[in-house]
Amino acid sequence: MSQTCQTGYAYMQPFVQIIPSNLSLACGLRILRAEDYQSSLTTEELISAAKQDAEKILADAQEVYEQQKQLGWQAGMDEARTLQATLIHETQLQCQQFYRHVEQQMSEVVLLAVRKILNDYDQVAMTLQVVREALALVSNQKQVVVRVNPDQAGAIREQIAKVHKDFPEISYLEVTADARLDQGGCILETEVGIIDASIDGQIEALSRAISTTLGQMKVTE
């Protein structure tokens, strides 16, 4: 056993610490008390436990950091998906607005062109053509009353015979003035119902057909 003399003060008496390769006894101490050695061991255990606790705290902190890092990444991805969905929705709305605008413009252009062409025709001749087409729909009726614009009623009466001869099934055909109708207006009254064959009505039907066609094109796309 070797003896090392050191000067110092501690909360307990100097003692010998047993180390496998070395055993040293404090200066002036010949006997190692059991309680002193046990106290030394307890102190070392506390230090060791403290180190383990510190290591565990560091490990837990690292784990929490990784978890928060993963949560941050996931939150970023969720935010990106939300932003993407918002942009897609806004783009779809803009496309719908654009299509509606184009649809309205196309419809207006087509209808304007049709009206311009119709205005170049003789209005009485055009009304007679409308009457002819309407009579074809009710040719199985015996009696038909044709209502037209008052300004055209006289001219239509003078020429209605030319149209009537193509529909011999109709035994009675009368032309009467109706102030509610514009030029080109034509309403046929029969025993089973009324048919509005006015040019304005046909143009409106054309407008609806254009809108329907454009709507189907958008769905297909």
UniProtKB/Swiss-Prot annotation:
SUPFAM superfamilies: V-type ATPase subunit E-like. InterPro entries: Flagellar_FliH/T3SS_HrpE (IPR018035), T3SS_SctL/SctL2 (IPR012842), T3SS_Stator/FliH (IPR051472). The keyword Cytoplasm applies. The keyword Isomerase does not apply. Pfam families: FliH. Keywords: Cytoplasm, Plasmid, Protein transport, Transport, Virulence. Induction: At 37 degrees Celsius in the absence of calcium. Gene3D superfamilies: 1.20.5.2950. It is found in: Cytoplasm. GO terms for biological process: protein secretion by the type III secretion system. GO terms for cellular component: cytosol. Component of the type III secretion system (T3SS), also called injectisome, which is used to inject bacterial effector proteins into eukaryotic host cells. Acts as a regulator of the YscN/SctN ATPase activity. NCBIfam families: HrpE_YscL_not, PRK06937.1. PANTHER family: TYPE 3 SECRETION SYSTEM STATOR PROTEIN, YOP PROTEINS TRANSLOCATION PROTEIN L. The core secretion machinery of the T3SS is composed of approximately 20 different proteins, including cytoplasmic components, a base, an export apparatus and a needle. This subunit is part of the cytosolic complex. Interacts directly with YscN/SctN (T3SS ATPase) and YscQ/SctQ (the major sorting platform component). Belongs to the SctL stator family. This is Type 3 secretion system stator protein. It comes from Yersinia pseudotuberculosis serotype I (strain IP32953). The lineage of its organism: Bacteria, Pseudomonadati, Pseudomonadota, Gammaproteobacteria, Enterobacterales.
